[in-house]
Amino acid sequence: IAPLLLSAALVSCGSSSDQVDPKRPIFSPLDTTTMTEVQKYVQNYFGKKFNVDIRYNYEDRLASNLYKLGPASEAQALKYLNLMRYTFFEVYEKVAPKGFAERHTIKQLVLFGTLGYGPTQNLLGEAPFGMIQVYDINRLNIPYFDADDYEASTFNYYYQRARDNYIQTLYHESAHTLHQDSPVPEAFLKLTISDYQQDNAFSYWYVRGISSLTAGFISDYASKSPEEDFAELYGTYMVLLPEEWENLMVQADYKYKPDSRYTGREILERKLAIMKEYLKANYHLDIDVVRAEANRRICAMADYRKLPTTEAYYEFIKGDFSKLPPSYYSTIPKE
């Protein structure tokens, strides 16, 4: 998971903590007689269909001893589940090879309502022992462009937050399952092998006043390790619109050191090319096809006027993310 160094940080999911066998059944059906409608939705859709175990009711045994965590409300958990379904699982289901989502996406997910409050930093999430934990669910807000109370600045804040704090994390984590099955290509590693900073991934660039983009990393966090480099590149490329990606490449189009052979842009574009070849060779996955579908859905959240037609936007607004899908019946009160 990629940290954010503003009001909160997101603890990384090191490769040793992400070892979940994608072929091993994770989800076990439970007795539905005492379940809420949302719990049935989790079991019948996410569990049975994608073999993912999702928990949103607070369980002390799953909470970190290092951070203070609060429970997620069921209404907010439902928003997150629907956002995840629309921008992540349905994307893979529609355009990825058959069975890809079941084998190569997140397997265990725990939702908490608050930030992880700690003595030195506040966390947006972590991934202990392969169990992805997402915090701050109670502050998730999914804006609608044509809402009566629409205000551009507020809308853009919530849209960017929903995309960059929640959706990108899902793609980042799914990338870790890929390199666990098939290691990151050596050619990818060699491009910046001497510049990985491990636990100094943030302080190194900040102290020197250098953009990690110019060194060939899509984010400061990507410089932590080859595995996080791979996952950050995958997740970021997947959610950014083409013009946003190009803007990053323009910022990266400088040499990190005077004697550097390549600019950061050249390194990043080479890494991306290697990643694309790797995904096609090992998983028959065309990342540009998946990205186009992800962009289509995410773009609908931002502004339907950016789309060639309004089809995607109307598809988006037909689904109220605060409610269960039509095949379920919700008794959850409006917030």
Task: Put a short name on every predicted segment.
Residues 52-64, 106-113, 203-213:
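Short, charged, low-hydrophobicity "junction" segments
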Residues 1-2:
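Bacterial N-terminal signal peptides that target proteins for export
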Residues 18, 78-139:
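Auxiliary, metal-adjacent structural segments of Zn-dependent hydrolase domains
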Residues 13-101, 261, 268-335:
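Acidic/polar, low-complexity intrinsically disordered N-terminal segments immediately downstream
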Residues 141-272, 276-283, 287-290, 297-298, ...:
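Active-site-flanking segments in enzyme catalytic domains
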Residues 65-66, 70-73, 118-120, 217-224:
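Generic detector of contiguous secondary-structure segments
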Residues 8-12:
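C-terminal motif of bacterial Sec signal peptides marking the signal peptidase cleavage site
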